[in-house]
């Protein structure tokens, strides 16, 4: 819960519009597994398949961090690229990944996600294999506002979707709870 005086007592220290490059990689992941379910007694050997379709978002920068799992590229605001419509003060970042590198990164991240989902089925994995069907990746730039503000002497940050105005991620100061 945010403090009640956050809007009044916070001070904006940075507001920057950046167009970040993303690769949207549509793919289907099919994972076959074998493992032990040990939550019940006696332990049971389980075999199965986990299949999911993804529109996996990959940030087109190598060293940058961005909460891609929390962000959904808004499809309704998608327009053909026109450099003349970029705001003058905005930072426009190009991709450091080509489409093949984006697909490799998407496959790695999706396989990790499939392994995470597998933990709901078995406790101990003895065999795991994933195959992919990948469609053509789409290269997009998304307008994002990066915000930094101060509240009671501490610095906080936020990221806002420039297309929809929705909050993607924000650091919120802790509220002081007092017992009466």
PLM-predicted stretches and their roles:
Residues 160-162:
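A charge-rich, low-complexity, intrinsically flexible signal that marks solvent-exposed coils, linkers
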Residues 155, 166-167:
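Hydrophobic "anchor" residues
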Residues 1-155, 172-180:
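Charged, low-complexity helical/coil segments in non-catalytic cytosolic or luminal regions
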Residues 164-166, 175:
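Short, surface-exposed beta-strand-loop junctions and turns on beta-sheet-rich folds
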């Amino acid at each position: 819960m945010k403090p009640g005086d956050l809007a009044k007592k916070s001070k904006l220290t940075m507001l920057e519009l950046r167009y970040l490059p993303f690769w949207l990689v549509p793919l289907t992941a099919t994972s076959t597994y074998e493992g032990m379910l040990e939550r019940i007694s006696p332990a049971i050997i389980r075999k199965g398949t986990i299949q999911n379709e993804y529109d996996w978002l990959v940030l087109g920068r190598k060293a940058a961090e961005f909460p891609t799992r929390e962000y959904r590229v808004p499809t309704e605001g998608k327009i053909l690229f026109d450099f003349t419509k970029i705001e003058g003060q905005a930072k426009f970042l190009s991709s450091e990944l080509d489409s093949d590198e984006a697909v490799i990164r998407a496959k790695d991240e999706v396989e990790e996600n499939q392994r995470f989902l597998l933990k709901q089925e078995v406790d101990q994995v003895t065999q795991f294999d994933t195959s992919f069907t990948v469609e053509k990746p789409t290269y997009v730039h998304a307008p994002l506002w990066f915000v930094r503000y101060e509240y009671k002497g501490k610095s906080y940050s936020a990221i806002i979707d420039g297309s929809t105005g929705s909050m993607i991620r924000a650091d919120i100061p802790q509220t002081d709870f007092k017992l009466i």
